[in-house]
C-alpha cells in the first residue's frame, strides 16, 4: 500500500521511507511509491550483476573462424593478417580461461606485432578484436612515451587508459587488449647500443619489457608522473594482450638486402629487388630484420606473433567505401536520409576517390577526409531546403572539383530536375 507521513500527510517512498519533500521525484505504481534515489540504486545493482556475467568461459570464446568472419564484416582484405590475429587471440584467451597451466605445461603469452603501411587497417583490426571479445580496449601512441624521469608519458599511463576503459574495474582490465601504435618510432637510432641515453627510443623499449611480459604494475590513478606520496592501482599485466603496430618504413630494404645475399649461386634465379613489392617482401620477415631496424632483442622476444599487412590497392579501397557494416558511403547515405534526401555515388566516383587516397598515400584512413571535402557544401545547404530528393556524386566531383548533382522537385508542377549544389 502507499505510505503516508502521519504528521504532514505526505506521500513516502515505499522502499527507503523518505517523503516527497526529501527526494527529487516520487514515481507512483499500483499501491506503491518509489523515489529517484532508490531507482538509481536498483540500476546500479542490475548493472553490477550484468558486468559479472560478462566474463568469458572457454565455450564462450569465439573460434578462429568465427573471429575471422566478424573481422570480415568491418575490415576489407588482409586475409593472412586476419587468420594470424584470430589464432593468436583465440589461444591467448583460451590460455587465460584454462589457468595458464595444463598438465604442468605452462602456456606463455603471445603478444603481437603488426607491420603495414599507413591506413592499411592495423588500428581497426585491433579495436574490432576487442569488440568481438567484449573486453576493455586502449590505444596508445608510442611517440609520446619516454622512460621514467624525463618529460613525456610513463609507460604506466598506457595501463591507466585500459583501466579507464574498464570503468576502473581492475579485474576486467586485466583481461583487456592494449594497442600501441607507431612502435617503429621508438626504434633506436642504430643497431649497435649507444653510449648516449636514448630516452624516447631504446629507453622506452626497456620500460615496456616488464609490462609486455607480465608484472604487477603500479599505476597512478590520475595519470602523470609517479611520486612517493600518492596511492597506486595495482594491475597485473600477465593476461593483458599487447598488440603493437607500425609502418616500419625502410624495413623492406633490410629484408631485400638479406635475401639478396642468398640468391647468388649456381642455378639461382636472380630477381631484381625493385621487382618485388613491399607486401611480398614483408612475407620474408624474420625477427633478425626487426633487430636490424632498431628494436632491441629483449623487446622482439616478447612479440612472438608477427602479422604483416599489405598496402591497399584501388579495388580494396572501393570495397572499403561500400561493403563493411560501418562503410563510409553507408554512413553518409544515412546522414542525408535524415534530411529526406537519397545519396548515390557512381562507380566511377568511388574509383576516383580510391585513386585520390592512393595519390595522397593515406590509405583507408584518408578516405573520410576526401568524402568530407566532397559532401561539405551539400550537407551545409540541404537542411535549409525541402525541394531536394536526391544527391548524385559523379567522378567529375572528384577530378574536376565540381559540385554534386542535386535532383530537385518543383512542388507546383511536381516535375523533377537536376542542378548543381
UniProtKB/Swiss-Prot annotation:
Keywords: ATP-binding, Chaperone, Metal-binding, Nucleotide-binding, Zinc. ATP binds at residues 117-124. GO terms for cellular component: HslUV protease complex. SUPFAM superfamilies: Glucocorticoid receptor-like (DNA-binding domain), P-loop containing nucleoside triphosphate hydrolases. Zn(2+) binds at residues 13, 16, 35, 38. Pfam families: AAA_2 (PF07724), ClpB_D2-small (PF10431), zf-C4_ClpX (PF06689). One of its GO terms (molecular function) is protein dimerization activity. Residues 1-54 form the ClpX-type ZB domain. GO terms for biological process: cell division; proteolysis involved in protein catabolic process. ATP-dependent specificity component of the Clp protease. It directs the protease to specific substrates. Can perform chaperone functions in the absence of ClpP. Belongs to the ClpX chaperone family. NCBIfam families: clpX (TIGR00382), PRK05342.1 (NF003745). Component of the ClpX-ClpP complex. Forms a hexameric ring that, in the presence of ATP, binds to fourteen ClpP subunits assembled into a disk-like structure with a central cavity, resembling the structure of eukaryotic proteasomes. This is ATP-dependent Clp protease ATP-binding subunit ClpX. It comes from Desulfitobacterium hafniense (strain Y51). The lineage of its organism: Bacteria, Bacillati, Bacillota, Clostridia, Eubacteriales.
Amino acid at each position: 500500500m502507499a505510505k503516508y507521513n502521519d504528521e504532514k500527510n505526505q506521500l513516502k517512498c515505499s522502499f527507503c521511507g523518505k517523503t516527497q519533500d526529501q527526494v527529487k521525484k516520487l514515481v507512483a505504481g499500483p499501491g506503491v511509491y518509489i523515489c529517484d534515489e532508490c531507482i538509481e540504486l536498483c540500476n546500479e545493482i542490475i548493472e553490477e550483476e550484468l558486468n559479472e556475467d560478462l566474463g568469458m568461459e572457454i565455450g564462450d570464446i569465439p573460434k578462429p573462424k568465427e573471429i575471422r568472419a566478424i573481422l570480415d564484416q568491418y575490415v576489407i582484405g588482409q586475409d593472412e593478417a586476419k587468420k594470424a590475429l584470430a589464432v593468436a587471440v583465440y589461444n591467448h584467451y583460451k590460455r587465460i580461461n584454462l589457468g595458464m597451466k595444463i598438465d604442468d605445461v605452462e602456456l606463455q603469452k603471445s603478444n603481437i606485432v603488426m607491420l603495414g603501411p599507413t591506413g592499411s587497417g592495423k588500428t581497426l583490426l585491433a579495436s574490432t578484436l576487442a569488440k568481438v571479445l567484449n573486453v576493455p580496449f586502449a590505444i596508445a601512441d608510442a611517440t609520446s612515451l619516454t622512460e621514467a624521469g624525463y618529460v613525456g608519458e610513463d609507460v604506466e599511463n598506457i595501463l591507466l587508459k585500459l583501466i579507464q576503459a574498464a570503468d576502473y574495474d581492475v579485474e576486467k582490465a586485466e583481461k583487456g587488449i592494449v594497442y600501441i601504435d607507431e612502435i617503429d618510432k621508438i626504434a633506436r637510432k642504430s643497431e649497435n647500443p649507444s653510449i648516449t641515453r636514448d630516452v624516447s627510443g631504446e629507453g622506452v623499449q626497456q620500460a615496456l619489457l616488464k609490462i609486455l611480459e607480465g608484472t604487477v604494475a603500479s599505476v597512478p590513478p590520475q595519470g602523470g608522473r609517479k611520486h612517493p606520496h600518492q596511492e597506486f592501482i595495482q594491475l597485473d599485466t600477465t593476461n593483458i594482450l599487447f598488440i603493437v603496430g607500425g609502418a616500419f618504413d625502410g624495413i623492406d630494404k633490410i629484408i631485400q638486402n638479406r635475401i639478396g645475399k642468398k640468391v647468388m649461386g649456381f642455378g639461382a634465379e636472380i630477381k631484381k629487388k625493385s621487382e618485388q613489392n613491399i607486401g611480398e617482401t614483408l612475407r620474408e620477415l624474420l625477427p633478425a630484420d626487426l633487430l636490424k631496424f632498431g628494436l632491441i632483442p629483449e623487446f622482439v622476444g616478447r612479440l612472438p606473433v608477427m602479422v604483416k599487412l599489405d598496402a591497399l590497392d584501388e579495388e580494396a579501397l572501393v570495397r572499403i567505401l561500400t561493403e563493411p557494416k560501418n562503410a563510409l558511403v553507408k554512413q553518409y547515405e544515412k546522414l542525408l536520409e535524415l534530411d529526406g534526401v537519397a545519396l548515390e555515388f557512381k562507380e566511377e566516383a568511388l574509383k576516383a576517390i580510391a585513386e585520390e587516397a592512393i595519390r595522397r598515400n593515406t590509405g583507408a584512413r584518408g578516405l573520410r577526409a576526401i568524402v568530407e571535402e566532397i559532401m561539405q557544401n551539400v550537407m551545409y545547404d540541404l537542411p535549409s531546403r525541402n525541394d531536394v530528393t536526391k544527391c548524385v556524386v559523379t567522378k567529375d566531383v572528384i577530378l574536376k572539383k565540381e559540385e554534386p548533382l542535386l535532383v530537385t522537385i518543383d512542388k507546383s508542377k511536381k516535375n523533377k530536375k537536376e542542378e548543381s549544389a
